[in-house]
Amino acid sequence: MKHLSTFKLFERLDNSTLVTIEQLLERIGIPNPMRPTIVSWWNQNRSEIRIHLFPFNSPQPIAGVFLGENIIALNERLPMPPHVKLFLALHESRHCDQHREGGFMEGYYDTVVNGDRESFLQAYRDFERDANDFAIQSMRACGFEREMNFEEMRLRGNERAGDMVYQMMSNDIQRVNPVDFFDLLKKQIGV
């Protein structure tokens, strides 16, 4: 319940940024012939996920975040290939699942608040690997086999960024004094 006010504030502020999967694919530039397959897959597997697309107001290169059990936000400002933005949407949507399944807040946020770097690094690797596995498998199912074959290692680079993320979160927690993880994310992206 403590996160409810954060969710309501986010929803109130950003309903204008809510996009359908069809709108997302169009705005990020996915080729028309691929869209029906992706839309069908998304509607079967991710229909509960609400997608927000807008330019983040952040000096940090944050590409996307999840903001609850079924809310993701993607940074429209960062230049990246269309299939990478779709990968990012899938990756963040898996973080929604992880949050619903439990353990995410304790491993990802509470460890930073408590200064437990080692526990954070282990949880971070596990959560990111799982989200990447899901996104890569989903991209293959949506017709991006070739792209995943060529780019999987690069797309998995975030799995090795735990130290950087820990430091950024630590600094931001001290600077903005968030009430919870979602408040931190909201403040990081300028919502």
Feature-to-residue mapping (PLM):
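Short acidic, low-complexity intrinsically disordered linear motifs used
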Residues: 1-13
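Polar/charged side chains located within well-ordered beta-strands of beta-rich proteins
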Residues: 11, 22, 94-98, 151-154
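Zn2+-dependent metallopeptidase catalytic core
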Residues: 14-46
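Active-site scaffold of zinc-dependent metalloenzymes
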Residues: 46-84, 93-100
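Acidic, low-complexity, intrinsically disordered interaction modules
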Residues: 79, 84-87, 104-105, 134, ...
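Post-HEXXH active-site segment of zinc metalloproteases
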Residues: 83, 99-129, 133
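Long, well-structured alpha-helical subdomains associated
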Residues: 116-128, 135-191
